[in-house]
UniProtKB/Swiss-Prot annotation:
It catalyses: L-seryl-[protein] + ATP = 3-O-(5'-adenylyl)-L-seryl-[protein] + diphosphate; L-threonyl-[protein] + ATP = 3-O-(5'-adenylyl)-L-threonyl-[protein] + diphosphate; L-tyrosyl-[protein] + ATP = O-(5'-adenylyl)-L-tyrosyl-[protein] + diphosphate; L-histidyl-[protein] + UTP = N(tele)-(5'-uridylyl)-L-histidyl-[protein] + diphosphate. This is Protein nucleotidyltransferase YdiU. The active site is at D248 (proton acceptor). Nucleotidyltransferase involved in the post-translational modification of proteins. It can catalyze the addition of adenosine monophosphate (AMP) or uridine monophosphate (UMP) to a protein, resulting in modifications known as AMPylation and UMPylation. GO terms for molecular function: AMPylase activity; ATP binding; magnesium ion binding. It comes from Salmonella schwarzengrund (strain CVM19633). NCBIfam families: adnlytase_SelO, PRK00029.1. Signal peptide: none annotated. ATP binds at G86, G88, R89, K109, D121, G122, R172, R179, D258. Its cofactor is Mg(2+); Mn(2+). It comes from the Bacteria.
Amino acid sequence: MTLSFTARWRDELPATYTALLPTPLKNARLIWYNDELAQQLAIPASLFDVTNGAGVWGGETLLPGMSPVAQVYSGHQFGVWAGQLGDGRGILLGEQLLADGSTLDWHLKGAGLTPYSRMGDGRAVLRSTIRESLASEAMHYLGIPTTRALSIVASDTPVQRETQETGAMLMRLAQSHMRFGHFEHFYYRREPEKVQQLADFAIRHYWPQWQDVPEKYALWFEEVAARTGRLIAEWQTVGFSHGVMNTDNMSILGLTIDYGPFGFLDDYDPGFIGNHSDHQGRYRFDNQPSVALWNLQRLAQTLTPFIEIDALNRALDRYQDALLTHYGQRMRQKLGFFTEQKDDNALLNELFSLMAREGSDYTRTFRMLSHTEQQSASSPLRDTFIDRTAFDAWFERYRARLRTEAVDDALRQQQMQRVNPAVVLRNWLAQRAIDAAEQGDMAELHRLHEVLRQPFTDRDDDYASRPPEWGKRLEVSCSS
């Protein structure tokens, strides 16, 4: 089967990019590809059979119909206007046309210098490409909207970061790479007609049902806000910290995008800061909902030329509603509640307080809770707490709450185990795969990808265990 590519972005938004070709790496080689995703997209297996070089995966060749561009956008970084940014090391190769008429961006990260590289070198390193591939696939299998990873190419090209590393490329796929920062770029250049063109493009291709509706722009922004609210709720319930929620890292489609200094909670710490460059804690775990709202407010400002203020404010309210509604639903599912009762939030907050005092493992606590039996006054979870008197008091209230549901243990446990993962991508697991890959051993990278495809399956190995102490202290930064 021949892959078909289109160039809608290039054809319809000429002011938003620079056309250019990728710059290949030295001695590039394909070290991993996503066989399951490739099969779903009907990508011929022969494309991955590269023995001399890295082919399209390393930017050495293009497929018919590809028209590479680097996109320009701007943004607020750590709450401060940063001006023009753009694809400093990534190139949108083309948009794959799928059978249902939708498209999928093929974006090559680490593809070399672009006009938007600023002081950078246009490269990604093996460490960061491995982390992003693992994180995006982990999030997908957790059911959280995200970009996807299709392939990783390693090389012998030296790249200087905190230390000297080697260059790599990641083929990232997404329904769209449209960001809040695209709109900010033209708003602050005082080109509101181009801001409106971006909105028209989004509506035409992603919300076509609103094209002929008079209030289409207001409806569109409401949906952007709602999707963002649901995304942040998913992050908070699974314990995911993005680490660098700049406006240029926010997706119009409500996708998790730009994995850098991310982390999943190990010990439950609501003030967890994943990014060691975030000295003020702006992007700490418990601040993500308010930062997302702040970012939406920045986006709303760019839309004032063609959306009424009242409509923008209604959309921002929609964010809060979507966030709280989705978060509440997810947390009730994690606790095994099928109905909503007035004391549920208090019960959850009591558990969080107990976990924070004890440094309980976030993922393992909820997974162990999912094995609770109503009639049993004891729980294996009890042994993980030092203050067992406090746990016993909470657990008795929890069991009493379970008894108000007309649901048997088997059904409740089944529901809980579908939303409480046994495995998340802990930083130490990613680092173990990276360390091996940097020595030329890709086995752990492939094995970890397989494990992350089944996050809701109980395991008795170290993929589902608490991290070693050194694993809790790993520092990650924007170069990650």
